[in-house]
């Protein structure tokens, strides 16, 4: 039995209509289908939550065939790479957090891209040591790191897969050959990004223009069918042997595209061959009776853990929960404190010492929380000194890094019939990555997540500076929460660039602190407090909340909308699963009964 929540109307009349079941059709001018939380009828059931209906359908089908959560994740990502190319793909990378319901172990699979061996620390600077600008950096070969997604999924499958690896690509291959339907969101991003798509070889390669625009140079239309046979061929190769992605013709194609002018990159075949995905122990924060777990650096998940940890020691939330402006000011202050430390300390900890234990130490968080006043916001927030709580000293004095990582990302959650959970965030960095295509895939521009400068204005080294073989700092923060008995309680995560940290923390606060349902937590207004300003969704936040933030002393920017794409699953006390999917995107939830 299945229950697919809200099928957007642009699927009506199309070849996969039978996958969509809903009590009513939904359509809005913003192409953002709404959805409601779903509760399962039995604890043994599974759930899939993704940002795209076709990907959700694929994941659910794999679960019904006896696949694990990791098996489903492989099929989901193969489809998302095709139908949501603005967000993620096999030309990019990501992080997977996995909960094993037998061992109760939480592990992390790190598929973050790496910088080439011959990378230059000043590659994004001009002859005057000034930045060449984000768009020039993005639409270049300089911006592409070694893609890690295929290696990460292969490693996870070796440990947790139940079905043969090659079976998981069938849906994506069929869609690539026969055509997928261009969704409103894909069309919207082509429209928005259109002016940056290189249309002259002096600006960059013409890959994106040829794929995303029609013969008249206009964005491909909503509802039109788009084939991608190069991608189908790539998938066949990966399905046969994932290692061929890094050693064979696909690798050669990737290197050739990266090394094209203008602004050619240094990525080599040796860089491709040398790439390794990593299996790591999850980084966990104790918050009350719970364990909140996510990826260690180069992910910035430590800031998510710190936000929830700080709230243990700030003045208590009032019983009015999300309705009380004071509660939002407390959450904003926790964000500011956590972002300040993240911007200062976090980078690939294979290259830089990161005081992770100190940043999550309860005594340190208690000390930092004393900076929070119930009366008035501090004009500015400086990073703290977690090294005192790390039982070691800093190797270097580090400079502040406010580098943005732009919102071209996706997140999904899968719970299989045995209770194993995947929380996975994937990205090509900015929208359509570098705009260069190899093997039918958009190649990432993840190296723009590094600081363009090696030092700050005071001459201090920046932790997230460019170095050969290094993984750039990421905001991707897939999260799994365990209850007091070590059982799965919640999985969450989001796209959204630097705002991912705040978006993800919002759902944790909503469910764990304010006792909201998964969907209610997703629907809360997104608020991001990084630095000295607060940004909040004006159409979702009440006037009282916005005014309360101003009264507290913040400079508040009311945003027309935020680029989150939250996918959430919560296990209720009776063992049932409850899902939440972001109405700001096109995602759906599918329940799988076994």
Describe each model-derived feature in a short phrase.
Residues 18-19:
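C-terminal motif of bacterial Sec signal peptides marking the signal peptidase cleavage site
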Residues 82-89, 93-108, 265-268, 420-485, ...:
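Active-site rim segments in enzyme catalytic domains, especially the processed small/beta chain
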Residues 313-427, 560:
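Internal maturation/activation junctions in enzymes
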Residues 469-471, 504, 513-561:
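Extended C-terminal subregions enriched in glycine
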């Amino acid at each position: 039995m299945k229950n697919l929540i809200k099928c957007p109307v642009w699927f009506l009349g199309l070849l996969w209509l039978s996958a969509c079941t809903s009590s009513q059709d939904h359509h809005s001018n913003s192409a953002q289908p709404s959805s409601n939380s779903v509760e399962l009828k039995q604890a043994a059931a599974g759930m899939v939550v993704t940002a795209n209906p076709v990907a959700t359908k694929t994941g659910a089908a794999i679960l019904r065939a006896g696949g694990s959560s990791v098996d489903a994740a492989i099929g989901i990502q193969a489809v998302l790479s095709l139908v949501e190319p603005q967000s993620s793909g096999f030309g990019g990378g990501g992080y997977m957090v996995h909960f094993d319901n037998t061992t109760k172990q939480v592990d992390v699979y790190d598929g973050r891209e790496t910088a080439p061996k011959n990378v230059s620390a000043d590659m994004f600077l001009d002859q005057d040591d000034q930045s060449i600008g984000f768009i020039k950096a993005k639409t270049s070969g300089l911006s592409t790191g070694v893609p890690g997604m295929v290696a990460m999924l292969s490693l996870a499958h070796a440990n947790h897969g139940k079905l043969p690896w090659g079976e998981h690509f069938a849906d994506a291959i069929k869609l690539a050959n026969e055509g997928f339907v261009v969704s409103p969101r894909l069309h919207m991003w082509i429209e928005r990004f259109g002016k940056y798509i290189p249309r002259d070889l002096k600006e960059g390669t013409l890959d994106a223009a040829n794929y995303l625009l029609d013969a008249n140079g206009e964005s491909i239309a909503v509802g039109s069918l788009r084939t991608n046979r190069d991608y189908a061929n790539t998938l066949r190769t990966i399905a046969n042997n994932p290692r061929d992605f890094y050693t064979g013709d696909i690798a050669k194609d990737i290197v050739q595209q990266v090394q094209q002018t203008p602004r050619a990159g240094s990525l080599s075949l040796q860089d491709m061959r040398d790439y390794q995905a990593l299996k790591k122990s999850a980084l966990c924060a104790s918050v009350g009776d719970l364990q909140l777990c996510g990826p260690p650096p180069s992910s910035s998940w430590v800031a998510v853990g710190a936000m929830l940890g700080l709230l243990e020691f700030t003045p208590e939330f009032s019983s009015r929960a999300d309705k009380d402006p004071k509660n939002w000011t407390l959450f904003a202050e926790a964000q500011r404190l956590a972002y300040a430390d993240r911007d200062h300390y976090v980078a690939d900890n294979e290259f830089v010492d990161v005081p992770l234990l100190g940043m999550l130490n309860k005594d340190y968080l208690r000390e930092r929380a004393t900076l929070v006043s119930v009366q008035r916001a501090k004009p500015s927030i400086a990073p703290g000194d977690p090294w005192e709580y790390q039982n070691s000293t800093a190797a270097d004095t580090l400079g502040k890094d406010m580098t943005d990582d732009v919102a071209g990302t996706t997140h999904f959650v899968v719970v299989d019939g045995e209770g194993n959970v995947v929380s996975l965030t994937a990205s090509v960095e900015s929208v359509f990555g570098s705009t260069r295509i190899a093997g039918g895939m958009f190649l990432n521009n993840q190296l723009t997540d590094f600081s363009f400068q090696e030092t700050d204005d005071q001459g201090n080294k920046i932790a997230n500076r460019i170095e050969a073989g290094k993984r750039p700092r990421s905001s991707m923060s897939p999260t799994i929460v365990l209850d007091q008995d070590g059982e799965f309680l919640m999985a969450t995560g989001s796209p959204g660039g630097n705002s991912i940290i705040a978006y993800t923390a919002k759902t944790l606060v909503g469910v764990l602190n304010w006792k909201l349902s998964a969907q209610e937590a997703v629907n809360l207004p997104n608020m991001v407090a990084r630095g000295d300003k607060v940004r909040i969704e004006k159409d979702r936040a009440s006037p009282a909340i916005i005014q309360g933030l101003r009264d507290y002393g913040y400079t508040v920017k009311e945003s027309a909308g935020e680029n989150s794409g939250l996918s959430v699953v919560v296990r209720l006390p009776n063992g049932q699963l409850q899902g939440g999917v972001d109405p700001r995107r096109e995602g759906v939830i599918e329940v799988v009964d076994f």
